[in-house]
Structures are given as C-alpha cells and as structure tokens.
C-alpha cells in the first residue's frame, strides 16, 4: 500500500498543479473519482487487466466510461498510465488528489479508528479538537476496529495520533523490554 502511494504521489501532484492552474479542480476531482470507482468494479478491472487489450483499447474503454468528463488532459493521463502499466494507481492518484484539493481548500480529512462506534457528541468533540490543533476544517471518516480495545487512533495526513489501549500496551511492552 505504501509503495502504491509513493508511486502515485508524483502523478497526483502533477495533475493537481495542472487542475489548479486551469481552475478545474472540481472537474478533475470528479473525473478521477469516476475512474477510481470504475476500476473498483470487477468487470472493468478485469477488462483493464486483460493482457490481450492494447493500451489504446484500455484508454478508449476508460474514456468511454467517463464520457464528456474525459477531456484531452484526462486522456493524456490515461495514456501515460497505460503506457507505463500503472493504471492500477488510479485509485491512489484520486485519493491523493483529493487530499491535495482539501489542503488547498483549507480542509483536512481525519481517519478515526475506534474500538466502538463514536456518538455524534464524541465525533463533534473530536472534530472541534482537531480543528483547534490544525487550524483547518476537519472532515471525519470514522471506522470501528475492535482490536484497539479502547480509545481511538487518528490519522491526519501523515501524522498518527494513537490514543488506543492497544497502542498504550504496545508502548509499555517496548518500555519493559528495554
């Protein structure tokens, strides 16, 4: 996963700069989201991965799925990815593009993993605390991970805040071993 993100980052940054310079962040965001969602479909994924298809056929297929959302620049991106056998990066490129777009718009996404589902009040309190810490609007993406035992693990950008029982036990175990 980390390798995909590393390889996808330059593509996402290049597309973001282009979209920002042209004032087309929303259009690129929509096109990349459509491409990522399309590749999540088993039939499309299988068709793209089919070694009997040429790069041009794959680009035409994906361009057809996008319809009028596939401008010249989007087709250029698809051609570059197909030529380098990196179409599988599209979901990671879309995700990183969205992160860059949110930073540009002054919004951060916080991935919150908790041992139990968060209440509305807990979510609001977490969002307010993170907004105060980062000085930006916060969008929460919550998930439940029972292996945390209790507490939460928060991921904002590249920063991890581990306030889980599992994390604390892990830290204590390391301390005891040394």
Swiss-Prot record:
Q: Which UniProt keywords are listed?
A: ATP synthesis, Cell inner membrane, Cell membrane, CF(1), Hydrogen ion transport, Ion transport, Membrane, Transport
Which InterPro entries did the record assign?
A: ATP_synth_OSCP/delta_N_sf, ATPase_OSCP/dsu
Q: Which GO terms describe its molecular function?
A: proton-transporting ATP synthase activity, rotational mechanism
The topology of this chain with respect to the membrane is: Peripheral membrane protein
Tell me a GO cellular component.
Answer: proton-transporting ATP synthase complex
Checking Pfam families in the record gives:
OSCP
Where found, per UniProt?
Cell inner membrane
Record note on quaternary structure: F-type ATPases have 2 components, F(1) - the catalytic core - and F(0) - the membrane proton channel. F(1) has five subunits: alpha(3), beta(3), gamma(1), delta(1), epsilon(1). F(0) has three main subunits: a(1), b(2) and c(10-14). The alpha and beta chains form an alternating ring which encloses part of the gamma chain. F(1) is attached to F(0) by a central stalk formed by the gamma and epsilon chains, while a peripheral stalk is formed by the delta and b chains.
Q: What does this protein do?
A: F(1)F(0) ATP synthase produces ATP from ADP in the presence of a proton or sodium gradient. F-type ATPases consist of two structural domains, F(1) containing the extramembraneous catalytic core and F(0) containing the membrane proton channel, linked together by a central stalk and a peripheral stalk. During catalysis, ATP synthesis in the catalytic domain of F(1) is coupled via a rotary mechanism of the central stalk subunits to proton translocation. This protein is part of the stalk that links CF(0) to CF(1). It either transmits conformational changes from CF(0) to CF(1) or is implicated in proton conduction.
What protein family is recorded?
Belongs to the ATPase delta chain family.
The protein's name in its UniProt record:
ATP synthase subunit delta
Question: By which gene is this protein encoded?
Answer: atpH
């Amino acid at each position: 996963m980390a390798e995909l993100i590393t390889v996808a980052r330059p593509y996402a940054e290049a597309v973001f700069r282009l979209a920002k310079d042209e004032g087309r962040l929303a259009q690129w965001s929509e096109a990349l989201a459509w491409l990522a969602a399309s590749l999540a479909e088993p039939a499309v994924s299988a068709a793209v991965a089919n070694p009997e298809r040429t790069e041009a056929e794959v680009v035409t297929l994906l361009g057809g799925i996008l319809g009028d959302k596939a401008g010249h620049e989007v087709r250029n991106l698809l051609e570059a990815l197909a030529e380098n056998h990196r179409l599988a990066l599209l979901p990671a490129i879309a995700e990183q593009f969205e992160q860059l777009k949110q930073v540009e718009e002054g919004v951060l996404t916080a991935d919150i993993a908790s041992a139990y589902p968060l209440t509305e009040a807990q979510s609001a309190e977490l969002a307010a605390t993170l907004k105060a810490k980062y000085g930006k609007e916060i969008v929460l993406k919550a998930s439940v991970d029972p292996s945390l035992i209790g507490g939460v693990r928060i991921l904002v950008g590249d920063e991890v805040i581990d306030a889980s029982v599992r994390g604390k036990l892990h830290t204590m175990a390391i301390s005891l071993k040394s």
